[in-house]
Amino acid sequence: MSNTVHVIVRSPRVAKPKEFTFPSDEKVGAAASQAGEAFGYPKGLNLTFENEKEQVLNRDQTLAQAGVDNGDKLELVDTGGGV
């Protein structure tokens, strides 16, 4: 298993997706917050990812535990409401 995961993240606010490489043991919530900052979201939101199966990932799991693999396409979502 790789120590990192390379993903493509889309945001409803920005047309062009961005690519990120995260440690596979990073929490989903922390990775989503980093991606959110790159897309210009304010800090303090409860951001997470939704995978291509439209499953919202648990912010408290690591990316590996959430089943995130290299090349996955993820959507940035706010669990506190719409972004």
Please give the residue ranges for each predicted region:
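Ubiquitin system architectures
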Residues: 1-83
